[in-house]
Amino acid sequence: MDDSDDEYSRSHGETLTFVDPEDDGVSIGNTQDSQFAYEQFSVPTQSSQATDLLPGGTDGTTNDLPFHDVEDDESDSEKSLTEEQHEQKLPEHACRYCGISDPLCVAKCTVCRKWFCNSNDGTSGGHIVHHMVRSQHKEAYTHKDSPCGDTQLECYRCGSKNVFNLGFIPGKKDQVVVIICRTPCASIAFQNDDNWSPEDWKSVIAEKQLLSWIVNVPSEEQVARARKITATQAVRMEELWRDHPEATVDDLNKPGLDREPDHVQLRYVDAHHYSKVFRPLVAIEAEYDRRVKESASQAVGTVRWEQGLRQSVLAFFHLPQFADGVMKLAKGDELRLKHSQTVDGSEWTKIGSVFKIPDNHGDEVGIEIRGAVDKSVMESRIMFTVDVVWNATTFERQYKALAALLNDSKAISPYLYQKLLGHPAEEMMLKFDLPRRLSVAGLPELNSSQMQAVKQVLTRPLSLIQGPPGTGKTVVSATIVYHLVQKTEGNVLVCSPSNIAVDHLAEKIHKTGLKVVRLCARSREHSETTVPYLTLQHQLKVMGGAELQKLIQLKDEAGELEFKDDLRYMQLKRVKEHELLAAADVICCTCSSAADARLSKIRTRTVLIDESTQATEPEILVSIMRGVRQLVLVGDHCQLGPVVICKKAAIAGLSQSLFERLVLLGIRPFRLQVQYRMHPVLSEFPSNVFYDGSLQNGVTENDRHMTGVDWHWPKPNKPAFFWHCSGSEELSASGTSFLNRTEAANVEKLVSKLIKAGVQPHQIGVITSYEGQRSFIVNYMHTQGTLNSKLYENVEIASVDAFQGREKDYIIVTCVRSNDILGIGFLSDPRRLNVAITRAKYGLVLVGNAKVLARHDLWHELINHYKSKEMLYEGPINALKPLNLALPKATIRTKNNIAGNANRFGIKRMQYTFNEYKSNDPSQPRLPPTYSNSQNLLSMSKLAQTFNKNVPIPAHMMDPNVYAAARNQKDRRRGDQRRPPPQAEAAMDLSQGMMSQQSQQYPPQGASSQSQYLLDGASSLSGWSQSQTTTTTTRHHHHRQNRNSQQQMSQDMDDIQQKMDDLLFSQDC
């Protein structure tokens, strides 16, 4: 298990649990994990064959691999055994994966009573640990003949049996160790006994195996004689055991056991084909979500009761599984509270909506129960149990949207229908008289790239806007909506997959003076929101009329109405809701809520979807199956993508957003290019690596100098540094996440020092990719922090996902991963790194093990950047000293690629810019310029024209009869070695927008054709910008191979220069 063990809810920042992405098998899904190769991220695998299905699996393995028994060599006369005979011969305590039965090497899962060995052959950890992670069984029992004897592993103080939370410390007597849980017992012991320190505690699990003095690791000879099992098979066994506990490995080979769904495609024949692909994926995701939610039942003990508003009752309780990261909740989710301690033994049950989840202010979960609760229940000490109520509404709406696409010809315009399916459609422009002034009162003035995006979007039926961090995409979206309202009949619908993003955009649009209604799902009408004054519920109370207002007040006071009054209330409410929605200029809601029945009669022809790269295609479909004629998608495919919890669905392509697919089809996004968030020092690395050096700084160093704060950075005028620390990682109590106690202690030191320096706690954010680390830091600050625990409550400690789209003045990133062999998991995803290091305005601190992280090429580049800028340090916080570290050679390639300046660390690119063609060194990074004087439109236009020459060369300007050949990756060289620029692009079917590698063929030796150029191909989405047309794969090669082709192409460069100048001139006009 790796970081895919940690995933997070995009709406409220709570986490979703994922398991072991470094295993090769299909497991709980994580769409932003290192298991996805960079081709799947930047140009998904289907792009290599635009009309073919995606290849199955992530690692080339099949799902029906048979097991092979190893013959027993002890007796020459013994014949090989069949699988069935082998199973019959094995003793009860044999490993259920591989069959190893040495009592010294096995342990029993106390929950399911199955035995497993401590070998990691075929899996990323010991078989017993792998089983406990996958099944979420957390208790183990050693064999009577094992080193520890017949023993239940448990804490000697509290009796906790959670193996993932157990460790040991030296006993006060020689040759004795004490098994004790990490929290709370070890923490208490360290505080009360000076003879013990936190460094003395060691986990009983190291490198995902039980320590050998507890359960021996099988020898190489034992492993060689055992049944061979792959990670895929182990995962499938765990899934099979959920419904069939007595299943054996033979059952894996039964036909039809695990049919893989069809993969998404770049293009679809028709709506029937589209629906046939996506309906099974939605069904798989829905079933998996249901299973996960309904299996999350646990005892919560006693409940604390309070009287709420509107005659509701509030129930507060502790959820141990939430603290462990097993149960995932978001505000608005429904929980079922129940007990069986009634007089007649019947079950008492109530359903409530979650309004509070554990945070820095407290570790209780709070639910609001509508209606009365018997006093006898509230006053008795009853032991309650909690279940999660699964809500199928979201998936049902996706089914209906797919059906509408199939059956309703009026559900979407013919043009958008063709674009959705990937068919060629004649480009069209909408009739729209552009206003003389594009900037809107109440919003900041637009810069040049923002103006260009607004102009283009208003006149097109389909537009994509890419908004890198801090570039003001919310301002641009609000401006677009304002102008659309002035020219469009009916409402403009604004959607996002995230409630937080909807609230933020609704607030920004409201500042323009438009009438905005924030439509919430009925289950969330009483949930917290940052724009309560815009909600439909609030506007009903204010503008609903005297009779309706009276009934609303009566309902709030009494909790419910009499039958006659309730009918009248519902009638008046429906009429008034329709009036308010019909009269609104803009309706804001989530993508799912766009299918709310209250919108069924509202005419909407224009839809803008914010954060569209975080939504799956069926989610987007829900928003647009309303007869939509104009669609604007806003997002950034270089940041986090959709959350898909079922890995099988994610691998099949459900995790690819519509935004990404449209880019692959040749629709050019308009990229915003001026960032207003980060100090220029902080923006340099993400600009060069993730955005091809295109980000300009709209703020200066002086703008990002914090006054009134007594904080001194190790390197003056450089508000960032990497703090190297070598503490070891540990599995968290959930078994599906990680924590690093050394880094947590250093984070507390940094936070405390910032607060002492005058920084307000709410200005500080701590980012981690691991729920285990987040939970540990929160607890550590409250129990062992040097300042008053109240001061830490307003320090936000959250996941990367929770911080996307947001910012803080100071950001601390704790990397957590520190091991010798297991890799860095989540951290290998460049999109996560991009989000994490682009949240800070004034200062950024990275805390991690530089030696371990530098083995990965992208982190090697980041750490080398910090080292070159003299921002790499080690030592105590008050005595930091430069780290003189010889960085190890990066041995792990980036799998998820969004590299812009790709040649710097060997990542392919889809295209090169015209300036790179003209220059002789495309590998030279372009530093982000400072974008000054935003009020001078003439200088803005001139600068934009100059800067926009850094765009990919349109394919039609190149010779269409070009051959391309891939160069061996081993021939790549890092450093400052100069390479010739590419001289041509691969052949391409422009009418279809095909990016087929079939057109890239090796030319015959000695061919004299002028189109005989060897080019270096690539696949990255990050280089697409507002000046881009349909691009194809380009390839450049070694000097000696290219010398002749350079001479052949030189005569065409002047013509290309003139065509590019004409293109840029026409765009600027």
UniProtKB/Swiss-Prot annotation:
Start-end of Polar residues biased regions: 28-50
Chain residues that bind Zn(2+) 3: C155, C158, C181, C185
Pfam families registered for this protein in UniProt: AAA_11, AAA_12, UPF1_1B_dom, UPF1_Zn_bind
Main location: cytoplasm
Region (C3H): 95-127
Bias kind Low complexity: ranges: 51-65, 991-1013
SUPFAM superfamilies, per the entry: P-loop containing nucleoside triphosphate hydrolases (SSF52540)
Domain of life: Eukaryota
Keyword field: ATP-binding, Cytoplasm, Helicase, Hydrolase, Metal-binding, Nucleotide-binding, Phosphoprotein, RNA-binding, Zinc, Zinc-finger
Residues bound to Zn(2+) 1: C95, C98, C117, H127
Domain Upf1 CH-rich: from-to ranges: 87-244
Catalytic activity as recorded in UniProt: ATP + H2O = ADP + phosphate + H(+)
Region ranges (C4): 155-185
Gene3D superfamilies: 2.40.30.230, 6.10.140.1240, P-loop containing nucleotide triphosphate hydrolases
Annotated segments matching region CC/SHH/C: 109-137
Full protein name: Regulator of nonsense transcripts 1
Lineage, uppermost ranks: Eukaryota, Metazoa, Ecdysozoa, Nematoda, Chromadorea
Gene: smg-2
